[in-house]
Amino acid sequence: MDNLNINLINDDEHPIPSQDLLLKCLQLVADKHHISHAEVNLNIVSNDEIQQINKQFRNKDKPTNIISFEFEKPQGLPDDIANDFLGDIVIAPAVLENEAKEQNKELNDHWQHIFIHGLLHLLGYDHQDDQEAEVMENLEIQLLAQLGIANPYIEQENQNGR
């Protein structure tokens, strides 16, 4: 894991899982995509901060659990520098805690799911339509199973009739 790095920014010291747990998620995603070097910025923020970011970048004036910003290489930046950096992930722990309680999920399991979800966004996955969502969700389910975490969409599928 020496070639994988998470730059953690948690200025307000919000409670989060161990960095080892998050690195395990990054390792799984990197292995699945044959990535040997990867770097990610992980910003841990309050509900107010993520709401501001969500409004500014997604025109949604409400808190969300995660927002990912895929890295776009500036012109002239050498490939050996740019290729390792995947992008920035912003997570609001209070939103994750509420979701985990509402969905009767273990908090660390939910953290791992949402972090993997964000990492996949950095690699270009999306869920703008049903087909994209199915591909992304299936990959998340597969990766989470490797961590011993049950399919997080089962309850939602039953509620949505999917």
UniProtKB/Swiss-Prot annotation:
This protein's UniProt keywords: Cytoplasm, Endonuclease, Hydrolase, Metal-binding, Nuclease, Ribosome biogenesis, rRNA processing, Zinc
Q: Which coarse location class describes where this protein primarily resides?
A: cytoplasm
Q: Which cofactor does it need?
A: Zn(2+)
The UniProt entry, under Gene3D superfamilies, shows: Metalloproteases ('zincins'), catalytic domain
* Biological process terms in GO annotation: rRNA processing
**Family, per entry:** Belongs to the endoribonuclease YbeY family.
Q: What is this protein called?
A: Endoribonuclease YbeY
Source species of the chain? Francisella tularensis subsp. novicida (strain U112)
Upper classification of the organism: Bacteria, Pseudomonadati, Pseudomonadota, Gammaproteobacteria, Thiotrichales
